[in-house]
């Protein structure tokens, strides 16, 4: 249809295709059993009024105006600016829509999604500027790109938008025109990461794992196999570069270590769901198991972690959930099974 110049018909047919598609899934969301916490419901409802949950360290959340100002920076903390572009309230809006059936959530999500695209153009910039090496010297659209298009934030959106796509897909607000804008934007995100991967560390792991999501969830893109392969190749390489023989992640930070475990596991989750687990060798799993035991051995009896380096405190509830998840991967490991019980 597209080749015949019938773009509107092609977009409608593509939307019908995605609404009927059943062969691609993500482990993050079960559409038959959507649940929402009280906190997520609050984020969704606040989001309708453009009061966006960005960071737990800055509460109550800030309002970004009726005409959203994506460059609003109420406190000059880089994290507040970066994390705005992770759109943490979008998936809760999707859950609220699915549970309530109220179209206001879908309509507002589609509006904010397009508004973000319009107001955050990707302009050319030296890759090193994503780490703010020329702080204070860059202004305007280029300055905004450092925050809106930093590869870590882009990868956040790549992953989370697979859930949002599924949650909002049945909505009348998810029009053929919107689908076209969504797919063009999503493609731009993946291409951007491919050319701007972080050099090392947990950021590189996050980006690689989320490129696997992009390639697995949208296999219809011609470049999807290359996206998936790039992520898998990086994780298979970096699990040996970043993890010492004793199981410790080389940034020597308990929180980054925990994040790395879950990144490696998340990649296995999307692989299992979509049938490409064999692309991860046995020593990949062995290393994850070693990392889990390392983490258990540096944790306190109440499941919390020591807070050195850039670490933040975990909770027992969060860690029991982690151990339960890990125990499914390593059912023969009695120590992990022990920590998974209370």
Question: Model regions: which residues?
Answer:
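Extracellular glycan-targeting catalytic surfaces
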Residues: 1-199, 205-212
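Short secondary-structure junctions and interdomain/linker hinges
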Residues: 21, 25, 116, 123, ...
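Short amphipathic alpha-helical segments at helix-loop
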Residues: 74-77, 142-146, 174, 219, ...
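Structural helix-adjacent loops and short alpha-helical linkers that scaffold large soluble proteins
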Residues: 96-110, 165-187, 215-233, 271-289, ...
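Alpha-helical scaffold segments in carbohydrate-active enzymes
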Residues: 115, 160-163, 167, 185-195, ...
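Alpha-helix capping and helix-loop boundary segments enriched in small/acidic/polar residues
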Residues: 148-152, 177-181, 198-202, 222-227, ...
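Carbohydrate-active enzyme catalytic cores, enriched for enzymes
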Residues: 244, 248-342
